[in-house]
């Protein structure tokens, strides 16, 4: 039986109309696939093996990547679930040398401020094993920068604003899928979050209704790329199972 929903303000109904799922357009769940248990395990094993190879890279090759690869990865990101299906994200793909240079210059201003004044000693100590500093040459070396924006609200054709629900969570989900898709294609990424990032709105011409979420650096790793010798937590350290 399909549950009904009565719209109320406090204890008083706004309307007598009761809404059910059948009141809205629906379509059959055509593309769902169920796999036999052994195949399910095998598929997950291969997926885990592949995704566990993903590493954050800070040394990129300037080798070009065909744009259609980036477009397909972005299409995958666009399938992410979102609050009320409002899809509150916008991706700006930057490949032009002039714009990448502007972004690097603005980002390094904020990064120098961070490392010299804003960051606490504890924060700097946490970053030390990663070997990061205020110099960000990868912002110009990598073939693509993808600036991810979250939209706090949308606009109807008549100019009215539409509130977006859970834009941070929704954009985070879409970005996670994007990173995974790019890794699956054989590309490396770096999530870069200089703070504040308002300069991205100015350089990329995005409206105030959009907030920079992060800057994704995308490309092939340099031939001699090195990454920090760090490890990931085992399952038992970040998971709890409750079966009663």
Located regions from the model:
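Short, electropositive alpha-helical surface patch
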Residues: 200-213
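Short loop-to-beta-strand entry elements in the cores of soluble alpha/beta enzymes
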Residues: 84-95
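N-terminal accessory segments that position/regulate proteins before the catalytic core
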Residues: 5-57, 61-71, 117
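Glycine-rich, charged/polar anion/phosphate-binding loops
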Residues: 76-78, 129-134, 200-202, 225
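Glycine/small-residue-rich phosphate/adenosyl-binding loop
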Residues: 20, 93-171
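Glycine-rich phosphate/pyrophosphate-binding beta-alpha loops
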Residues: 78-84
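C-terminal helix-cap and adjacent tail motif
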Residues: 15-43, 133, 214-244
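Small-aliphatic-rich amphipathic alpha-helix that forms the alpha element of a beta-alpha
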Residues: 73-77, 146, 152-203
């Amino acid at each position: 039986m399909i549950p009904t929903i009565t719209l109320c303000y406090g204890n008083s109904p706004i309307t007598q109309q009761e809404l059910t799922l059948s009141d809205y357009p629906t379509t059959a769940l055509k593309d769902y696939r169920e796999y036999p248990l052994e195949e399910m395990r095998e598929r997950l094993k291969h997926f885990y093996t592949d995704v566990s190879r993903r590493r954050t890279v800070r040394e990129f090759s300037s080798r070009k990547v065909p744009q259609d690869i980036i477009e397909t990865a972005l299409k995958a990101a666009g399938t992410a679930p979102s609050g009320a299906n409002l899809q509150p994200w916008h991706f700006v793909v930057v490949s032009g040398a002039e714009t990448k240079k502007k972004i690097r210059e603005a980002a390094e201003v904020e990064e120098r401020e961070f490392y010299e004044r804003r960051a606490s000693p504890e924060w700097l100590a946490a970053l030390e094993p990663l070997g990061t500093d205020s110099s960000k040459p990868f912002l110009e070396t990598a073939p693509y920068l993808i600036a991810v924006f979250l939209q706090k609200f949308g606009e109807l054709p008549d100019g009215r604003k539409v509130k977006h629900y859970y834009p941070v969570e929704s954009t985070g989900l879409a970005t996670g899928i994007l990173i995974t898709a790019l890794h699956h294609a054989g590309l490396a990424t770096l999530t870069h979050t200089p703070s504040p990032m308002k300069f991205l709105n100015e350089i990329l011409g995005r409206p105030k209704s959009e907030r920079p979420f992060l800057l994704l650096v995308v490309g092939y790793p340099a031939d001699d790329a090195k990454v920090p010798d760090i490890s990931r937590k085992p399952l038992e350290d970040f998971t709890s199972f409750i079966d009663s």
